[in-house]
């Protein structure tokens, strides 16, 4: 009998099921949480799309507790002081960071530390449109200064500045937002060329973005902007805000409460925009109903020098109030837990913490949430 007529030989290969790569969730939950805690937070929306199990862990309180153990999150606050001289005015910036205590025995205690930010050309001359990405701060040309295309990047881990790739055109007071791993800069230029451009963080290159469909280019001159979903929002005044859709440049206008608010008094947590208004208090924007709603359950002071930002899944509320020390003021912080339900968003306040006493002329310019 030929070999072709012989019956097939049995093999000792294992069944195909045993060749399947082990799942992440075959590991203990604590190990999975520690792995996720080391991933930069800007990738969390992508991970949420991978599986329901990942989405559940990323949206759980446990992930924030684990990140706290690693000291992954921090707030960077920048105050400015202005000194008047006979021939010129000088603006000086003072940086602080709010972070977890390095003492591993107490992972819930916060410390407010002054940090030394090296001088760089133009740094003390004008405020910037800053955007935090992982552990770096990208500085886009600000306002009250000749327009520029230069982008500066501050590495909070090394404590050093570096000059990034320049934009294609000079801008100032532009709308800036981070969407899908790219920085979008809209408006802020007087010419007709390149009304919007986008910076790819991977390739470190600028290219033209979809042309904004707003008829008036002044719609994008702003001093505060945020990102939600695939859109970048410009908060322009006490009456309205505009959105730019990064997919096609489409434009939409929304009303905002007629009240005083601060450039630093806005943030986005879990894809929800929060803004602190002097008269109405802390509010959030309901994108489904397209209206502003109050975060209920809070008793916040009608404070000035407001800064808010995400901090380990909670909202850090920072304000200043008069001090007993002459020509000084106190900087306070209160953490607010947020719980969303069918009826709205309920806030739970934690005890206030005195962060520092600073000179009375300290004015808050930036409040940035960074995550390692």
Swiss-Prot record:
Alphabetical list of InterPro entries matching this protein: F-box-like_dom_sf, F-box/kelch-repeat_ARATH, F-box_dom, Kelch-typ_b-propeller, Kelch_1
Lineage of producing organism: Eukaryota, Viridiplantae, Streptophyta, Embryophyta, Tracheophyta
Protein name: F-box/kelch-repeat protein At2g44630
Region (Disordered): 1-21
Placement of Kelch repeats on the sequence: 136-181, 183-228
Keywords assigned by UniProt, alphabetized: Kelch repeat, Repeat
Domain F-box: 21-67
Bias type Polar residues, positions: 1-13
Keyword Repeat listed: yes
Pfam families per record: F-box, Kelch_FKB95
UniProt keyword Zinc, yes or no: no
């Amino acid at each position: 009998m030929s070999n072709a007529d012989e019956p097939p030989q049995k093999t000792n290969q294992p069944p195909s099921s045993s060749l399947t790569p082990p799942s992440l969730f075959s590991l203990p939950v604590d190990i999975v949480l520690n792995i996720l805690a080391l991933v930069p937070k800007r990738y969390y929306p992508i991970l949420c799309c991978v599986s329901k199990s990942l989405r559940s862990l990323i949206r759980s309180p446990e992930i924030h507790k684990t990140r706290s153990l690693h000291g992954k999150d921090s707030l960077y606050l920048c105050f400015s002081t202005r000194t008047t001289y006979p021939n010129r005015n000088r603006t000086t910036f003072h940086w602080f960071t709010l972070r977890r205590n390095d003492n591993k025995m107490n992972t819930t205690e916060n410390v407010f530390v002054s940090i030394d930010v090296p001088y760089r050309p133009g740094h003390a001359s004008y405020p910037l449109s800053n955007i935090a990405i992982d552990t770096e701060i990208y500085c886009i040309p600000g306002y009250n200064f000749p327009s520029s295309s230069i982008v500066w990047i501050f590495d909070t881990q090394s404590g050093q500045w570096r000059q990034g790739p320049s934009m294609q055109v000079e801008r100032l007071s532009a709308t800036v937002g981070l969407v899908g791993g790219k920085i979008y800069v809209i408006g802020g230029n007087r010419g007709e060329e390149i009304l919007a451009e986008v910076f790819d963080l991977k390739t470190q290159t600028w290219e033209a973005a979809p042309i904004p469909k707003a008829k008036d280019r002044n719609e994008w001159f702003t001093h505060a902007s945020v990102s939600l979903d695939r859109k970048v929002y410009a908060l322009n005044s006490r009456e309205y805000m505009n959105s730019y859709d990064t997919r096609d440049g489409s434009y939409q206008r929304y009303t905002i409460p007629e009240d005083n608010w601060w450039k630093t008094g806005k943030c986005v947590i879990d894809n929800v925009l929060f803004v602190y208004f002097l008269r109405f208090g802390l509010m959030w924007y309901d994108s489904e109903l397209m209206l502003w709603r109050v975060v209920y359950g809070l008793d916040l002071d009608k404070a000035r020098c407001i800064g808010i930002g995400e901090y380990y899944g909670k909202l850090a509320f920072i304000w200043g109030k008069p001090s007993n020390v002459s020509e000084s003021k106190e900087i306070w912080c209160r953490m607010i837990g947020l719980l969303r339900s069918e009826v709205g968003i309920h806030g739970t306040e934690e005890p206030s913490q005195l962060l520092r006493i600073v000179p009375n002329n300290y004015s808050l310019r930036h409040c940035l949430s960074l995550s390692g």
